[in-house]
Structure formats: structure tokens, C-alpha cells
Amino acid sequence: MKLKSFALTSLTFCFAAICGTPSVQAATLTTIVNGISNARAVSFGPDSSLYVAEPGIGGNGNCQPSPSTLFQPICAGNSGSLVKVASDGTTQRLFNNFESIAEQPSGNQGAGIQDVQFDSQGNAYLLTGFAGYPGNRDLESLNLGANFPIPEQQLVTFPPSTPDKVLNTPLLAQLFKADLNTGKLESIFDFGKYEITNNPDGGDVVTNPFDLTVSGDTAYVIDGGGNTAYKIKLDGSESEAIAIPKKVLSASTLPPLPPGQELPPGLVEVLPGGNIAIQSVPTGGTIGPDGALYVAEYSGFPYPENESRIFRIGDDGNPEVFLDGFTQITDLTFDEQGNLLVLQFGDESQLQGDLRFLPGSLIKVAPDLTRTTLVAAGEGLESSAGIDIGPDGKIYITKRGVGPELGSVVRVDNVVTERVPEPTSILGLLALASVGATGAIAKRKRQNKLSEELLAKAEIV
């Protein structure tokens, strides 16, 4: 069951429960924009404008059960947008009333516009999510899905819709070349159709494209529903799908159930010897200093703490574990010094608290693999979803990524931290330390500095 709650302390850092990584001084978080519904990625355009993906809150249209919400219905509407904050601080919504699906009546766990990124010529590319069986998207995909198999457990928990109950959201689960001035969209890749016809990880047939990175002539898309990383030529001429493997854990990590209740079929894979295999649910991707793709995972039910991994995918297309011991990662990026910045949605399992306000954190992994907590749990990064480095070289993060109008983008300032050596990782040392800071490739193309007008409108929180 491909689970992404959102849709979406520590074996981390030298086993932080033993070593500890307290911040000497709490970082200052400066609010740039707020009032975003189910906020996702943050990015910067060629003119230094800031963009925030707003999947929306669904609506009163047709519904489908979703693995993203542990099979609770998510319903369609037109409430999504792309929020633009210009360099003078002016805010506007592009693609307003875009297709959206979310829980009702709460409006939580939205899927819609997920990310926007730009190539070196300034062209914009828009990614949309879905969070369910792609055959339910519209009549065309439903008819396509009728020709391909669906696992038995999926038929029990989130089956295909009937023709009169499809969501009528044909723009979801796609990658587009986008004209931000006219609103014109040109489809480059349809993840819904690809998942139906290919099912790269061999599990449930479900898709939820979550993260986009553009580098050179290639788009890199991380599909948290399909447990897959994609490499797609921007002209649509070639594509490659790389399945991200499950993680094997002791069955003792499963939470106790009330008497008489059982886990829904397919929620976890039960293995011999008292073990289980859980979904990876990858959520973030970035290109490293070595040119490889780095993929972060959130992990599926039961969302165990300290078990999320970061994979490195080189030219051979084989995902190898680069780092382990994180909790519910939603995004990552490299800065100009070659440090890997890792954003944790919550430092505790989402089963332990309110999904809207989990204590998230920001971790820096240096080229020598030293891990440092830049913003610790409880210091203001609740349920954080996206990260980028701004034109001013500072870190920008979307927080409170679940719920209507709760989301915001904050800038991270005044970071003073302790450093804790990372346990030996030969792979990591070879991959990063030998490259050096001068070779660092940031996730998104850096633009000119933000204007003083935008920063002047920021609010210290």
C-alpha cells in the first residue's frame, strides 16, 4: 500500500538520543507569506519572485478512498493555485481555481499543484499530484485501467470508481510546461497513465507526484504514491522510472490495535520471521555535487521514527541507501557549500499527534557527513513540506503543510548550532567529501538577490 500522509527522534545524528544535538541558539524564522492551503513546494523564478504550490482544499465533487488518508475519502473541487510573491512584496494567485482533491469537510491532505520549477532559459514547469488510484481520475483513465490488473488488497481498500463517480480531474498527476502569464499548460508526462500501464514498483496501482527538480534538459520527479523516481526529458522524448525499495522492520514496530480490530489488507507486507516491509513513500529529490539524484523518503504506515532513508541514484539507475536514521523527510536540497539540507515534516510519528502541527526540524549534513540540527523540533517548523535556497543564499521553508489557510513560507535566520560527527559511511564520504564545496549543485537554479522591498515586508515570528 503506497501511503503518503499529506497527501504525507533519533537514530539520526550519531543516534541523537545518546549524543544529543541541541541548538545553542534558536533560529529566527521570518514569515514571507502565509494563508496557504495545504502548502507544498517553495521555489524562486528568474525574476526573483517566490512561488508556493497550493494544492487547495478539494470541494464537493466526487470522492475516492485514498491510501494517503488511510482510505478515508478525498473529494474533488477547484480550489488550488500557485501563489506568487513578487520582488516588491505583491502577492497574487496564478492558475486560480485549479483542480484539487482533499478530505472533506476538513480540507486537509490536499493534492493538486505540487511544485513549480524553472529551466536555465526561464521556462516554467508545473507538477500536479493525485493521491489515489489513477483510474479514478477521469473516464479516459478509468477505461484504460480496465485493461490492466489491480492487486486484490487494493480492490478491498481503494477500488476503481464507477463511471459516474470518477473525479473529473484530468489535469492531476501530470508534468506540464507552463506559461505563467497566459495560464497555458502543455503536457509533458502523464504519471496516471504510466502508473496504470507500467506500475514500476509492482505494488498497488496508485500515484501521487510530489516533488520536481529541473536540471539541464531533464525533469526529476519523485512520486510518493508510486514509490518511484522519474527522469524525464523536458521535451517528453525519453523517460525512466526507478522504483524505490521498501524497508524491512520488526513487526514490533506496529502499533497495538483495539480488541477485535485488524489492519486493512495490504497496509503493510508481513514477512517470515516476525518482520514487516513498509512502503518507502519518497517525497523529495535533488541533484548532488556529484551529479547523482538524491531521494528522501517519508516512509509509510506505521510511520516509524528514525527509519527514513536518503537514497543516491547514480548513472546505473540503482537506488543505494546514502544515509539513514531520519524521521518523515519531506524535502532536501544542497546549498552552495555542498551541505545537504534535510527537512523533516515531524520528528515524531504522525500517529502521535495532530498532523497539522507536528514538530518538524531542519538538519544540515556537511560534506564530511557531520550532521547538525539547524532548527530543532519545537522551534517553529511545524509539519514542514518544502525547502529551497533563495537568491539571497538563505533557506526558505514551507511550514504547516496540512490544512486550509494554515501554511506559510518562512526564511531561516541567525542559525547557531552544535555539530555532532556522523557514524562512518564510506558511501557518503566517497559521494560528497571528495567533491568539495565548489562543485555543489543546488536543487534549484539560484537567481539574483531578493529585493529589499520583499524582505522589508517580512514579519518576524
Regions found by a protein language model. Name each.
Residues 438-461:
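C-terminal membrane-anchoring or membrane-association module
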Residues 383-418:
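Blade-level signature of beta-propeller repeat domains, shared across WD40, Kelch, NHL, RCC1
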Residues 35-47, 78-79, 100-123, 171-172, ...:
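Beta-rich, blade/repeat-based domains predominating
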